[in-house]
Swiss-Prot record:
It comes from Yarrowia lipolytica (strain CLIB 122 / E 150) (Yeast). GO terms for biological process: translation. It comes from the Eukaryota. This is Small ribosomal subunit protein uS9m. InterPro entries: Ribosomal_Su5_D2-typ_SF (IPR020568), Ribosomal_uS9 (IPR000754), Ribosomal_uS9_bac/plastid (IPR023035), Ribosomal_uS9_CS (IPR020574), Ribsml_uS5_D2-typ_fold_subgr (IPR014721). One of its GO terms (molecular function) is structural constituent of ribosome. GO terms for cellular component: mitochondrial small ribosomal subunit. Residues 300-319 have a biased composition (Basic residues).
Amino acid sequence: MLRLTRSVKNLSLGAVRFQSTQAPRQPKNMFVREAERAERDAQEAQKWRGGKKHLNFGVDMSISETPRGAAENVRVAPATALQYTGRGAHEQTMEVVNRVRRQYEFLPRNREGVSPPNFVTRITYLTMLGSSEPVSGPQHTELTKALADLYYIDNQLKPQVVKDLLRRFSRKIDTDAESGEIETLDEQGRAVTRGRRKTSSARVIVTKAPEGTVGEVRVNGLLLSQYFKELQHRSEVLFPLSVVQSEGKYNVFATVLGGGNSGKAGAISLGIARGIIVHNPLLRKRLSKAGCLTRDARTKERKKPGLRRARAAPTWVKR
């Protein structure tokens, strides 16, 4: 037993005596190995091509002309790194908008007396991008908020670059479609327009009142106060005139058919607003902002089976 122990001890000492003095070899990093492999492939390709220039990865090279090792390293790189975000088209657009914002962030903003901006909708913005990437609501809101910051720059100081950018994303509203066909004054200086509301239809003639006289409003041959007994209906008819502060400056003759007093008043009001624009097209923006040029498309909701009216239900009892 003693002899075996001494022999084992001598073996261990001998192993220590003949051990190498060099440090143990550390495993290489994965990125280092890949870099060395790419360098070897490039050297092989250079030798194979007869000492010509290095492989140009920006040129479209067919695999048949490149060694197998070098062909595996050829990758089609995207035009911008934003492509890796999954929404590259939107991020690239935001990068352009934010760059313009940073460039002109020192310019003063003016919100007083400026109409609110009207930018493209999310569906239109998706069409403008022309890509298969979806555009969510928060992404569209991000764009409109950035554009609104540029929109409120003082018009006297607004650069042409900002104007072109806003014009690209502005929604084009056809205001003539809201007011029907473009009307003109006839030989007698009258504006003949039409208006509709619910089941009522009105034909309205608007003329300027002679100087020194107060214009009047007649409905089916009767004065406005005689035809509409309620103040609410009379106020609705005269609302377009009050918006442009032209009470008493025009004579209005309306012929209205169908519906009740509420529908008739709405139809006449729309016809008056359209007639005012024929006389003075510069008032279109003010009337449109007040909602006078948009037809009210609401109608009475139909009665439902089992209900007393459209939505009113009878009292429920358990038994």
